[in-house]
Amino acid sequence: MIPICPVVSFTYVPSRLGEDAKMATGNYFGFTHGAGAQYSQQPAAGVAYTHPTTVASYTVHQAPVAAHTVAAAYAPTAATVAVARPAPVAVAAAANAAAFGGYQPAHAATDYGYAQRQPEVPPPPPPVTSQNYQDSYSYVRSTAPAVAYDSKQYYQQPAATPAVAAAAAQPQPTVAESYYQTAPKTGYSQGATPYTQTQQTRQVTVVKPATPSPATSTFSIYPVSSAVQPVAAAAAASVVPSYSQSPTYSTNAVTYSGTSYSGYEAAVYSAASSYYQQQQQQQKQAAVAAAATAAWTGSTFTKKTPFQNKTLKPKQPPKPPQIHYCDVCKISCAGPQTYKEHLEGQKHKKKEAALKVSQSSSSSSGGGSSARGTQNQLRCELCDVSCTGADAYAAHIRGAKHQKVVKLHTKLGKPIPSTEPSVVSQSSTSSTAAPNKTSSSNINSSTSTSSNASSSVSASYLKSGSMAASAAQGKSSGANNVSVNSSSIKKVNTPKINFVGGNKLQTTASKSDESKADAAKTAQSAASAPAADAKNDMPDPMSPQSALAALQSDVQPVGHDYVEEVRNDEGKVIRFHCKLCECSFNDPNAKEMHLKGRRHRLQYKKKVNPDLQVEVKPSIRARKIQEEKMRKQMQKEEYWRRREEEERWRMEMRRYEEDMYWRRMEEEQHHWEDRRRMPDGGYPQGPPGPPGLLGVRPGMPIPQPQGPVPPRRPDSSDDRYVMTKHAAIYPSEDELQAIQKIVSITERALKLVSDIITDQDAGASAKGKEEDKEKKEPPKDRLLKGVMRVGVLAKGLLLRGDKEVNLVLLCSEKPTKNLLTRIVEHLPKQLTMVTPEKYEVKGSIQESAIILTSCGDPKMQVTITLTSPIIREESSRDGDVTSSMVKDPADVLDRQKCLDALAALRHAKWFQARANGLQSCVIVIRILRDLCQRVPTWSAFPSWAMELLVEKAISSASGPMSPGDALRRVFECISSGILLSGAPGLIDPCEKNPTDTLAFMEEQQREDITSSAQFALRLLAFRQIHKVLGMDPLPQMNSRFNVRNTRKRRRDNSDGADGFEAEGKKDKKDYEGF
């Protein structure tokens, strides 16, 4: 007869997912009775996985016996001999306690809370775990340390052999405690007493899952140390329980595997299924071994293997609680959503980018040099901040921010560095590189049974709660009594923030690993020494002790008497007030720091003791102001240089175009002269067009009279006359060079005068304030802002004989007589510095100008008019001249002259933008300017109105026009009566309000110019343009009139006089006005 054995039931029911945020907020780990704990541990590659809302479902095989569920989220390795009770085992123990009577343990610490609730859904009946036992037995739960949870792959582990179970029969609390260490002891630890139960009767009944049987048990739970590497195959969905009878009883481990997964890749399915089949074979072998063991101990009841053909029911896996901690920002988040939003936030990204930049700069410099401005600074490794002095560092250590970080790291079990400051220098940076790397590699070393654990490469700052809770250093004396049985030791990437503490970080590695780490540290420090010595150009680094002493002893506090205490009604000091700096503070330490500060010392030197030595420390703002000033000066010099080059290029292009035109005219004249000398004389069907600039192309036959090429329209007679007149009135090369020379000299001399006046004004206003230069606002604009070319000089309309040009000097304030006098005084001295030639300078208050005249030949004159944009802004703002005149200084210059100078500036800009690029426009304007100077009738025509009229007439044409046609079109416009009073007039495009440019002309002057234009148009129609231009007639280029019609003319005109000459004699009295 087979005896009925008691059945030990382990029931895991998935807990609700909604309480994660609450538990993670206060570092609260809620392990509910009868529910599976939720874990998320960082894998070997430094990657943490979090469970989604819909977790994978587990399907457990059914067995025909009693209903007991074993569904854990950890698969310990069977090869580990160490007997311990990690956090997952504690959870299983809590579940077992709930099944056996609702055991509620008493806690030594308040960090963990347990709550018991009944499972909402009855669990499905899984296979039974049955054992044979004696009357008196010891019940010890034995499992390998489950230290990792991989949510992507689930593998079955081989069943524990009887030898392992027998070895696990004896409790070993000392070894377990030495293996799992915790510095702050955030978990709880009770006496590890074996569970003993004496049965009075041999009849036992099957325990139902919903009906707990009375039992008492004592458990010993040790927090898991994060120093152990996560196992690669630690994702199996089963727990390997091991029970030992005292002294002759041991059972096989039972494994259950789920075969239904959701939300994972197909590769994981195939890997899990193949591994599952292998484990089923191992289960069969384990069952045979169990039968043999039972026979050896006198028992005849063996464990039945689970059936593979039963229907599988899905069961959701447990989801462990997570602690969301960001290593970069050193903060914890309430939940996954908050943590995700933090990672996507700007603050985190900025800190991460700054960290990467600092790491790259330190790595590029060989790890031995720091950035500029960080030398001799005290650094807090925990908060990753640098302080400029010992007082600032002490205030930071006492501050709320540092204390908050310390509290958070204490909760998470992270190592807290020593509060002793580390001086940021070349030697300290290189010395901390090796310990960081070694300690981090030791922390992340652990057993590994598969290479799949390194398949993830994404970075994450999420740390597991179980891992973070036990990452501190241990206090046990037997810390190194456990050796780690590992197939390979892997090193993961070091975290982005390395904690370098004052004490050595203790890990669970063996002594050999520690010796290797020390050797690596020595080798790396030795390797960094020649790298530092290789940089000969770098100064020798100051030792941390000397730098710290220098920071502490350099500055002595001054001005204690000027800091008064402010007390409340009870006489208690509530704050301090500095009368020198007009500031308040409520911390005595801040008072000492303020008395040593540079701001207070500067105020003390300014108001109390001028002899106090204060180091000159150029601030970032002062340096930026200086750089901005230099940049503006370079830009201004570049602007003037480019402007001179553009002006030179414009003049050269204009001369080049005129030379090309005249070359073509000469070639055409030679061509027609050659044709006129030919014996046949002329062409029967009209002359063809003249050849190009290079003559007839080689190989091209000369056109025959019977089939000539369609002729190109030659330049008309009017074009020849206009271009000949333009060449006559164009300035010579000597005149152009003389004008360019005197203008350039004047501009450079005015620049020097502007510098002198600016320095004088700045020196007068800065007396007694030299110590506050770096705190001042940027200096105001200089009084003389710049000089601009205006009039015919800027427009390129100079004529032969023009000796006067105009410049405009812009001022930042309204120009006054005093300013004009100062410029006249300084300008002659600066002219001698620019050029050795003699120039005469005189000021004209009536014209609001300075007149500069050259003493050598040719005599040139430059008129420099002073003006300011403020004058036009005020007039446009209020429109009342009298009101603005009241505010002006007493010696302000003539307002209208200044406004005319501003208008000349706008006219020059408009002309360069609109008229300069228009074909034949500049030539026609020069012809009309010459006409206004020769003919008194046209002298009343304003030059600005004439420029507007020519530009409008030429730009409104359908296409480009030759000079003769353009001149004819302008005369046609004037002849149409556009200048008369009833006409629309010419509106000034450079004024805000509609302004007629012809408003200054009288009615008689308008009619005279209109009549003269009509008469000139008649002369152009009768081929007498030379009379309008005031030049002699050019020789006839086309001889066909003389050759073909000579005889006919002689017969009709017996006196021998030419028809054009006779007509010219009759009309001589009509064009005498031109």
Swiss-Prot record:
Q: Which InterPro entries does this UniProt record tie to the protein?
A: DZF_dom, DZF_dom_C, DZF_dom_N, Matrin/U1-like-C_Znf_C2H2, NT_sf, Znf_C2H2_sf, Znf_C2H2_type
- Pfam families named among the record's database cross-references: DZF_C, DZF_N, zf-met
The subcellular location is:
Nucleus; Cytoplasm
Extract the SMART domains matched here: DZF, ZnF_C2H2, ZnF_U1
Gene3D superfamilies referenced in this protein's UniProt entry, alphabetically: 1.10.1410.40, Beta Polymerase, domain 2 (3.30.460.10), Classic Zinc Finger (3.30.160.60)
Stored SUPFAM superfamilies: beta-beta-alpha zinc fingers (SSF57667)
Domain DZF intervals: 697-1073
User: Which segments show compositional bias classed as Basic and acidic residues?
Assistant: 767-781, 1062-1074
The annotated regions of Pro residues compositional bias extend over 700-711
Instruction: Report the PROSITE patterns cross-referenced here.
Output: DZF, ZINC_FINGER_C2H2_1
The terms under GO molecular function for this entry are: DNA binding; double-stranded RNA binding; single-stranded RNA binding; zinc ion binding
Question: What Gene Ontology cellular component terms go with this record?
Answer: cytoplasm; nucleus
Which residue ranges does the record annotate as region Disordered?
Answer: 344-374, 412-456, 508-545, 697-718, 761-781, 1036-1074
Q: Compositional bias of type Low complexity: which residue ranges?
A: 417-456, 520-533
What keywords would UniProt list here?
Answer: Cytoplasm, Developmental protein, DNA-binding, Nucleus, Repeat, RNA-binding
Entry function? Involved in postimplantation and gastrulation stages of development. Binds to DNA and RNA.
Q: Kindly provide the name given to this protein in its UniProt entry.
A: Zinc finger RNA-binding protein
Q: Which organism is it from?
A: Danio rerio
